[in-house]
């Protein structure tokens, strides 16, 4: 059917094989490309920049107000627009690779009744920003409100440097585990019919399809943020975790 086929068989990462291969797993985790490099390190970098340079100080979240929400929403929207927009422009507007690595040779539909406005991209973009980024921002601002009002334990990064560095990298493991569990849950038939089917309309996904979900699924998806109600916390953790989920 003209679908792209990889040159070689795609296998499981060595961390997920049996019998265990600890040496191969460690090599994969720290290799390039591997588990941390390049993408998870990229999310760490974006998250740290977002908190330390693109966010108000923690105390600003103590009195929840619309301005704080809109600042966070604007920053998150900028990240999403830049990230997905770059892939969309390069691969779907310029079509720089044409069909060379495209699994499905068709392009996203712009005449389909199953999508809002009859257009897959407009449908996906609307769900991404109106629901996805809004709920992402809600979890972020909510957790930071708890932290700024001393309802959860906030650490000093300099005084707890080892813990800070460890958590910055371990949050990806939590995010991946949470995604696996949530994904299994939303394939439970009632939840699938109610919410997850919206995501699965994208049988020919594009860059904007990743966050094109029903609001109920977004609530499940971004609930990875709730971990920080229970563990010693630094604001950078929540930003990195949600950047990992959102991008």
Language model feature labels by segment:
Residues 208-247:
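Hydrophobic transmembrane alpha-helices
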Residues 199-202, 244:
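Short, small-residue-rich loop/turn micro-motifs
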């Amino acid at each position: 059917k003209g679908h792209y086929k990889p040159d070689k068989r795609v296998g499981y990462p060595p961390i997920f094989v049996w019998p265990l291969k600890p040496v191969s797993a460690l090599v994969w985790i720290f290799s390039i490309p591997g588990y941390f490099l390049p993408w998870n390190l990229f999310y760490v970098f974006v998250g740290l920049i977002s908190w330390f340079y693109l966010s108000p100080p923690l105390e600003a979240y103590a009195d929840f107000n619309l301005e704080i929400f809109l600042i966070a929403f604007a920053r998150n929207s900028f990240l999403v627009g830049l990230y997905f927009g770059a892939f969309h422009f390069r691969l779907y507007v310029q079509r720089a690779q044409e069909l060379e690595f495209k699994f499905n040779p068709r392009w996203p539909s712009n005449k389909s009744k199953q999508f809002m406005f009859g257009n897959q991209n407009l449908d996906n973009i609307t769900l991404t920003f109106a629901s996805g980024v809004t709920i992402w921002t809600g979890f972020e601002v909510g957790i930071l409100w708890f932290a700024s009002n001393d309802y959860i334990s906030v650490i000093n990064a300099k005084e707890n440097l080892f813990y800070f560095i460890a958590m910055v990298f371990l949050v990806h493991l939590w995010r991946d585990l949470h995604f696996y569990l949530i994904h299994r849950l939303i394939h439970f038939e009632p939840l699938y019919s109610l919410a997850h089917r919206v995501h699965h309309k994208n049988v020919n996904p594009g860059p904007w399809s990743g966050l094109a979900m029903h609001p109920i699924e977004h609530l499940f998806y971004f609930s990875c943020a709730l971990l920080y109600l229970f563990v010693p916390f630094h604001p950078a953790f929540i930003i990195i975790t949600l950047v990992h989920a959102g991008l």
